[in-house]
């Protein structure tokens, strides 16, 4: 019998604590929750572990402030960083969170040199590229959670529009995890039926736009923070696909090297996820308009990467 997987979650805020909890509930492995705030991850982890007898989950959960306790992790999920506040775009967080991601990634690479890193911190695509650059890991072992969350939001809005089960809906959202993401109605179906057969074009466009600003809608409603239930579950879906070698196709932020005409930039594309992380980028046949939108989205990410390079974060 193989040993249980070790999952480290960096950052014990709302997203991080829920990633840890959902990993434990699904018994994906033993979980280490780490944060710079003294005693806080220990308290949250203890509370979670005290819940395990009630549902009979066989996962150990520990909290720590010491990266030595994260050594030899199979997967490291990085959620640490400042969340968005009302009126902020994800890009406004660039310099604040770059310092955090650089420091965290250096520790991750030191203690878990064979791990797969999943980045959740915004601005997502740029932070994922920074983590890849700092870690020195191969590109398949550093990826970002983005498109599967955006696709889940698109699916939720379609289900609300049609009054059908979300289980019936498949959707694909590509591009950077920002306001210029690229939902693809052409690749979106309800029980195999294209949504273009079920929803008028103007309503599809409204749902696409709501998906683009879906995170901001929640920030505006909450007023004191950003979304965490859906981002956490979207992340855990990726963790599960990798640890169980499920070979699932999910849109995530991966390093493009020529795919879709995008070079040297992390961007949301359909990825085959398995034990090696991103095992393949799937190239869809996009229309000219879809491809232009995807490349424009990647261009915005490139602008953020250029700033990080100028500031000395990316070598």
Swiss-Prot record:
The residues the record assigns to binding substrate are 84, 90, 122, 153
Q: Active site located where? A: 177
Q: What is its EC number?
A: 1.1.1.37
Q: Where does this protein hold NAD(+)?
A: 11-16, 35, 97, 120-122
What is one process in the GO biological process aspect for this record? tricarboxylic acid cycle
Query: Which InterPro entries does the UniProt entry name for this protein?
Result: L-lactate/malate_DH (IPR001557), Lactate/malate_DH_C (IPR022383), Lactate/malate_DH_N (IPR001236), Lactate_DH/Glyco_Ohase_4_C (IPR015955), Malate_DH_type3 (IPR011275), NAD(P)-bd_dom_sf (IPR036291)
Record's protein name: Malate dehydrogenase
């Amino acid at each position: 019998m193989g040993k249980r997987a070790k999952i480290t979650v960096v950052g014990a805020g709302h997203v991080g604590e829920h990633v840890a909890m959902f990993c434990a509930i699904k018994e994906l492995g033993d979980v280490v929750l780490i944060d710079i705030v003294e005693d806080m991850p220990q308290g949250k982890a203890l509370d979670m572990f005290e819940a395990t007898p009630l549902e009979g989950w066989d996962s150990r959960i520990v909290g720590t402030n010491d990266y030595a306790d994260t050594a030899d992790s199979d997967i490291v999920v990085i959620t640490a960083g400042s969340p968005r506040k009302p009126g902020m775009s994800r890009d406004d967080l660039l310099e604040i969170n770059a310092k955090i991601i650089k420091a965290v990634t250096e520790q991750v690479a030191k203690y878990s040199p064979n791990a797969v890193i999943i980045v959740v911190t915004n601005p997502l695509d740029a932070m994922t590229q920074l983590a890849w650059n700092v870690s020195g890991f191969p590109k398949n072992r550093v990826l970002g959670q983005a498109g599967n969350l955006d696709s889940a939001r698109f699916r939720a809005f379609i289900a609300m529009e049609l009054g059908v089960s979300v289980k019936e809906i498949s959707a694909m959202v590509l591009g950077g995890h920002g306001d210029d993401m690229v939902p693809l109605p052409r690749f979106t179906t309800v029980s195999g039926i294209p949504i273009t057969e079920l929803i008028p074009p103007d309503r599809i466009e409204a749902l696409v736009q709501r998906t683009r600003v879906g995170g901001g809608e929640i920030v505006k409603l909450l007023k004191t923070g950003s979304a965490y239930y859906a981002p956490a579950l979207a992340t855990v879906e990726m963790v599960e696909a990798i640890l169980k070698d499920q070979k699932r196709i999910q849109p995530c932020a991966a390093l493009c090297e020529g795919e879709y005409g995008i070079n040297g930039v992390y961007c949301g594309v359909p990825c085959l996820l398995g034990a090696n992380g991103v095992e393949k980028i799937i190239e869809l046949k996009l229309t000219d308009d879809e491809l232009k939108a995807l490349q424009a989205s990647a261009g915005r990410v490139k602008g953020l990467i250029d700033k990080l390079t100028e500031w000395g974060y990316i070598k």
